[in-house]
């Protein structure tokens, strides 16, 4: 099979080799998750340090913890205090010790990774894509123009809209923020000058996080996403400075096809509970059987509505979540 890795490094720069800092200085200044936190902050997200970890705001005025792979066992009183002080609607974090929604993180730790590591249905798709595309890092101007086109194509296909990727000015801010962070990279698939798919990845310490992936509808018959996933995963798998590749959380809405896609590329779904705490005032109103029933009925009437499915999952998570053992 022809090589698909046309560049020595598609994955961005490691933050572990900052020449200007000694190991002692880095130990004092580094906080787990701060690389992704800086990228998010430059994009306009609020970053908070509380409960011994970093948090960032997501649409809906919720807080989520960083880094994604760190399992938390928090004091519920401290979580509620953080939510009140930041005026957030709620917080969500992964835990092995709290109860909550059944969830998980897609992770790959293999060192030996090649075309044979893929599910048999994916192998011919990757081979076909190799004949049609090349893999290289996207340049800023390509992302500003063609990347935005891919965002619109992907969101239209999925029946959703995220202003950060759809609004031209907010997308420009996203790209500028990324290029201010050397750990953020944009591996992409091209047919000549035409971009067919891209990823946004973040390299922090010994983890590579695949943050976003977009593609052009017209190119899907030639499987650009399959080639991109394979190329990035293969390069990360053989990188001895990396411990693991993270392909994101299990989403709060139904996404069976996405789950199967990731597993077929050799990723494992490492289970955990997604713990959700609402603002105490909201909890009194929303964490009620009647409210959950109303949302459940709305989901049945409007099938495949990701916003309603997410709201239903959040309310169910709030009902289920709580510490099962005393916090450390």
Region locations from a protein language model:
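A conserved beta-strand-loop-helix scaffold within acyl/acetyltransferase catalytic domains
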Residues: 2-57, 91-100, 104-221, 234-236
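Active-site/acyl-donor-binding loops of N-acyltransferases
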Residues: 2-55, 96-115, 243-328
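STAS-typified acidic loop motif
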Residues: 52-53, 58-70
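Hydrophobic beta-strand segments of well-ordered beta-sheets in folded domains
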Residues: 60-65, 84-91, 243-245
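Extended catalytic core of nucleotide-activated donor transferases of GT-like folds
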Residues: 71-96
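Well-ordered, non-membrane alpha-helical segments in soluble/globular domains
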Residues: 71-80, 168-173, 230
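Residue-level marker for well-ordered alpha-helical positions
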Residues: 77, 120-123, 230, 256
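Aromatic (often tryptophan-rich) hydrophobic motifs at membrane interfaces
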Residues: 183-286
